[in-house]
């Protein structure tokens, strides 16, 4: 969703809009809502209102890929080395197009370990 002055947007108003779109009847299972603003040549600022979390998250790789793909197909960005800035940091996105069809999508950025855990053999048998 294009949104001018996204970085200065009222958080509560943006959250309410995200919630309305997330629960829109055309999306029976709900949807993540990605707000974006072009901030420079091949540079985007993005905020994601994520279903299940029901609030903004620091980043969403799937949503970021969709935003850059849509902007590329609309001719707003080149699709090469597009910098997407989010609360959680920056991703670099490359869109590999064959005509108007996306063949591959590459996201590059930092990673962090946020949780460690163990899965036992007994737990695997439940799946």
Predicted regions and their residues:
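Active-site proximal loop and beta-alpha junction motif in alpha/beta enzyme cores
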Residues: 1-59, 68-127
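An anionic, turn-rich surface loop/hairpin at beta-sheet edges
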Residues: 62-63
């Amino acid at each position: 969703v294009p949104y001018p002055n996204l970085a200065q947007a009222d958080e509560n108003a943006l959250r309410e809009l995200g919630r309305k779109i997330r629960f829109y009847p055309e999306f029976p299972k709900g949807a993540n809502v990605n707000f974006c603003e072009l901030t420079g040549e091949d540079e985007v600022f993005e905020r994601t209102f994520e279903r299940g979390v029901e609030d903004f998250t620091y980043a969403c790789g799937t949503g970021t890929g969709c935003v850059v793909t849509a902007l590329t197909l609309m001719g707003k960005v080149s699709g090469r080395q597009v910098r997407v800035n989010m609360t959680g940091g920056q991703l670099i996105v490359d869109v590999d197009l064959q005509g108007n069809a996306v063949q591959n999508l590459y996201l590059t950025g930092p990673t962090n370990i946020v949780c460690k855990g163990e899965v036992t053999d007994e737990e695997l048998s439940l799946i």
